[in-house]
């Protein structure tokens, strides 16, 4: 007779969860940040609000974003005037867009990740799908399973309405699945489309305008598994430790509410201060067991909620400017893509590390950290170990 402990041991992997492939995708429509205020105020019939437009222009200029990608084209917005009006009932129109586009964009990223992984999709055992863009039943996880032709008994996890910290959440969940299910190969997909949050400007709600200056569309996909098959699977990063915490005294700092007018976001001005105030504690908890206290000696992947958050974290920890290079590059080229952002940064970092002839996937360094920040205010922490190139 086999004991429970023997069964448990046989079910578990030996090594740490490892990222084995990364794929990303964006809509074809590219929006230049320098000309976006003109487009935005024209398409929302708000050109008469000249002072507000000047404020928005300053927001865009300070955003450190060069371009973003958006599913919403001028043609689509002209066909859906309720989406352009501030707080007009428009949820049906938005839902009709995102329930199709979110899994479609997710598929595009997933196909790239599966191709890089180099294994048949029949070997995928689990699927984690994450989006803050719309809600549906059966969910985007089901739609993606159909679009990719995955096996019907793939174990699916659908995460709706998590917000910007969720790039860390999917890694935490994927780590637990991979390490506790021997031979598991987890497809992780974050797909975000701003059709739920786009709306015209309001003089009385400038936090809504901040979102219009920052958010962009994108999808990222990973394959995660433990005990990579030698010569066949190529590890990129190992996930060593994860944590999630709610920052004290932060209630209401970041809120999102799904209403008839779509998804409304509310941000307090002190969000960057709350993040920078709590980041030291998160780092000590993560790196003290490794004997690391010099945070310039590790590589950095932080959700780029906006330039102010990155600036204050750098200042608080006395980080060298190059520490946030990959993070700022993704913010500059894509904007804030909510949950997908940190996965784009993982891809950017490993690509640049290879291009620059560095020793590891983590900018030549051994250890690194990935942070997600979002509603709550919730902080996700992932300790990463790089792989030799």
From Swiss-Prot:
Catalytic residues in the record: 164
Record Gene3D superfamilies: 3.40.47.10
EC numbers: 2.3.1.74
Catalysis: reaction(s): (E)-4-coumaroyl-CoA + 3 malonyl-CoA + 3 H(+) = 2',4,4',6'-tetrahydroxychalcone + 3 CO2 + 4 CoA
Gene Ontology annotations of biological process type: flavonoid biosynthetic process; polyketide biosynthetic process
Keyword Glycosyltransferase: no
SUPFAM superfamilies: Thiolase-like (SSF53901)
Keyword list, A-Z: Acyltransferase, Flavonoid biosynthesis, Transferase
Pathway assigned in UniProt: Secondary metabolite biosynthesis; flavonoid biosynthesis
Enzyme superclass (EC): transferase
GO terms for MF: naringenin-chalcone synthase activity
Classification via Pfam families: Chal_sti_synt_C, Chal_sti_synt_N
InterPro entries: Chalcone/stilbene_synt_C, Chalcone/stilbene_synt_N, Chalcone/stilbene_synthase_AS, Polyketide_synthase_type-III, Thiolase-like
Function: The primary product of this enzyme is 4,2',4',6'-tetrahydroxychalcone (also termed naringenin-chalcone or chalcone) which can under specific conditions spontaneously isomerize into naringenin.
Family affiliation: Belongs to the thiolase-like superfamily. Chalcone/stilbene synthases family.
Protein name according to UniProt: Chalcone synthase 5
Gene: CHS5
